[in-house]
């Protein structure tokens, strides 16, 4: 048993009313090693136990079984655990080497389904850096979800319906050509889309024409549908190339169009419950009874065309009926917050008790030199261009550091793409951040390549040793390894916390912390010294490679064997 498990077990014995998962999630590292190895804060227990946090901490220390620890002390509102170094080192290394990548797995989810609405680019537009966050956050959350015992279902809710397709069809019919589109489909369609908006600024009647074409598409017009199908097929080809580079797959590509024949059911349900109200010719749901600050949810426009809300309601109902999800996550930018608050409110009014299981996983913006990207204006940074540039930067550094490395191009792709993904996930999900590719692909500092390089370095030590590592000789007495041991020991708690907070940055920051601890040890230790501690040191190195590789996997980043 690793000592975090010992701590959780010991705490749960004196706090039987607190769920084990909640206890595990509260564990943290003290600000100073003088305060112990693991801290348990008691602030949030004050209301439940009706005691001051300091008193709760003191009572826990007086009642807890301390036999598995060096000592347990109360420091203000914290219970601080000082671990038995020898016992903890042995237990941690043996467990990691025995379990391998399964270390940190738990069954909190008991196999329940979690749908994850993610990526969801718009058809007929290239994937830009604006799509990166939803794509990689969703993928990492899916991996973290599975690690916590749930069954993730990744849904790419393609933006393949809406008035923009009416605008695009109008633009193509008015000034586009088939030859142009076939020569360079996505770039040409984007140019048409931007040109439409520029012309519509001068002549507003273009917007009416675009809406009219979309209404024809909704009504099943053959020409409109053929063009839409063509635009969709060309877009999916390019999207698939990007997803393949990021090694991201999906369980469903059911986009907005998939729900065309499923919206009437939702509208009928709203009507049956007398929730639909006519307002200036449109049909809305008044949400003021749930929250007086909420604006009404628009269900149908004055021309009878459906809106995003109608589709999202139909999608939510379909997903519950199809997957019976325990949680339904929507990885969508923070600017859509009100939309999801409205959607959950409508679902509640419809009588669905699972409305609270719908979660908006909001995230902040990526800017380039402080500027937000916009497809309508055309100042868009293409994701494939960023990945290409990241590959080239990674390859340049690899050629400088290790010119004899085999298959440099493959490693450069893993490092370049990994750098872009890691940088995104390293940032707290709801934060905005500016993107600088040169900093992102550096092999030093808080970067993905730094973690990958640390992992490759550790693997190279094991190759040099060229000996099997035994799990029976793990008597480390080197105090320099303690920082690594305690960091390794945190991994199961980190995995749980990342799921509970829906926050992949917890894993990324953990990987950086473990990398720093290992590199400090590497710089000051003779790991391959042939003495009676050699096996134990190699076991430590192997444990580091197991956990770094698994941390990178959870983030959706490759772990090259060599760099």
Swiss-Prot record:
Alphabetically ordered keywords of this record: Aminoacyl-tRNA synthetase, ATP-binding, Cytoplasm, Ligase, Nucleotide-binding, Protein biosynthesis
Single GO biological process annotation from the record: arginyl-tRNA aminoacylation
Alphabetical list of InterPro entries matching this protein: Arg-tRNA-ligase, Arg-tRNA-synth_N, Arg-tRNA-synth_N_sf, ArgRS_core, DALR_anticod-bd, Rossmann-like_a/b/a_fold, tRNAsynth_Ia_anticodon-bd
Subcellular location: Cytoplasm
Matching Pfam families: Arg_tRNA_synt_N, DALR_1, tRNA-synt_1d
Entry GO MF terms: arginine-tRNA ligase activity; ATP binding
Motif extent ('HIGH' region): 121-131
Catalytic activity: tRNA(Arg) + L-arginine + ATP = L-arginyl-tRNA(Arg) + AMP + diphosphate
EC number per UniProt: 6.1.1.19
Enzyme kind, highest EC tier: ligase
GO cellular component: cytoplasm
Assembly and interaction partners: Monomer.
Record-stated family: Belongs to the class-I aminoacyl-tRNA synthetase family.
Name assigned to this protein: Arginine--tRNA ligase
Organism: Leuconostoc citreum (strain KM20)
Gene that encodes the chain: argS
């Amino acid at each position: 048993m690793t000592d975090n498990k010992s701590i959780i077990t010991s705490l749960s014995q004196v706090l039987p009313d607190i769920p084990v998962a909640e206890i595990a999630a509260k564990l943290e590292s003290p600000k100073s090693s003088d305060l112990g190895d693991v801290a348990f804060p008691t602030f949030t227990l004050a209301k439940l136990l009706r005691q001051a946090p300091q008193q709760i901490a003191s009572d826990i220390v007086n009642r807890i079984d301390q036999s598995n620890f060096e000592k347990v002390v109360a420091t203000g509102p914290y219970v601080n655990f000082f671990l038995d170094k020898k016992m903890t080192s042995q237990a941690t290394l043996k467990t990691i080497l025995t379990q391998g990548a399964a270390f940190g797995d738990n069954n909190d989810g008991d196999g329940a389904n979690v749908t994850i609405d993610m990526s969801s680019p718009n058809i007929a537009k290239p994937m830009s850096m604006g799509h990166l966050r939803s794509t990689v956050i969703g993928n990492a959350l899916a991996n973290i979800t599975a690690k916590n015992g749930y069954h993730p279902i990744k849904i790419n809710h393609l933006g393949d319906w809406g008035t923009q397709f009416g605008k695009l069809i109008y633009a193509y019919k008015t000034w586009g050509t088939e030859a142009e589109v076939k020569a360079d489909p996505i770039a040409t369609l984007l140019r048409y889309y931007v040109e439409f908006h520029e012309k519509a600024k001068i002549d507003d009647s273009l917007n009416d024409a675009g809406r009219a074409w979309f209404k024809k598409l909704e009504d099943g017009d053959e020409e409109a549908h053929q063009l839409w199908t063509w635009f969709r097929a060309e877009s999916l080809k390019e999207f698939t190339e990007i997803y393949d580079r990021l090694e991201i797959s999906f369980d469903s590509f059911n986009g907005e169009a998939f729900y065309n024949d499923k919206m009437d059911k939702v509208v009928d349900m709203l009507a049956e419950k007398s929730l639909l109200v006519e307002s200036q010719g449109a049909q809305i749901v008044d949400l003021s009874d749930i929250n007086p600050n909420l604006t009404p949810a628009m269900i149908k426009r004055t021309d009878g065309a459906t809106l995003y809300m109608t589709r999202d309601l139909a999608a939510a109902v379909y997903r519950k009926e199809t997957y019976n999800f325990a949680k339904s996550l929507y990885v969508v930018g923070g600017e859509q917050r009100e939309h999801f608050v409205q959607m959950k409110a409508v679902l509640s009014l419809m009588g669905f008790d699972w409305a609270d299981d719908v979660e908006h996983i909001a995230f902040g913006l990526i800017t380039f030199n402080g500027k937000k990207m916009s497809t309508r204006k055309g100042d868009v940074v293409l994701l494939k261009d960023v990945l290409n540039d990241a590959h080239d930067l990674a390859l340049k550094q690899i050629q400088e550091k290790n010119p004899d490395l085999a298959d440099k191009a493959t490693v450069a792709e893993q490092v370049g793409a990994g750098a872009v993904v890691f940088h995104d996930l390293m940032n707290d999900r709801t934060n905005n951040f500016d993107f600088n590719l040169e900093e992102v692909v550096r092999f030093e500092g808080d970067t993905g390549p730094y973690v990958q390089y640390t992992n490759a370095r550790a693997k190279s030590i094991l190759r040099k040793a060229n000996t099997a590592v035994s799990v029976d000789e793990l008597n480390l007495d080197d105090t320099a390894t303690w920082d690594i041991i305690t960091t390794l020991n945190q991994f199961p708690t980190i995995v749980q916390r990342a799921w509970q907070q829906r926050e992949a940055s917890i894993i990324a920051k953990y990987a950086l912390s473990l990398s720093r601890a290992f590199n400090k040890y590497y710089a000051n230790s003779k790991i391959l010294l042939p003495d009676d501690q050699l096996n134990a040191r190699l076991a430590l190195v192997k444990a580091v490679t197991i956990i770094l590789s698994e941390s990178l996997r959870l983030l959706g980043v490759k772990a090259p064997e060599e760099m």
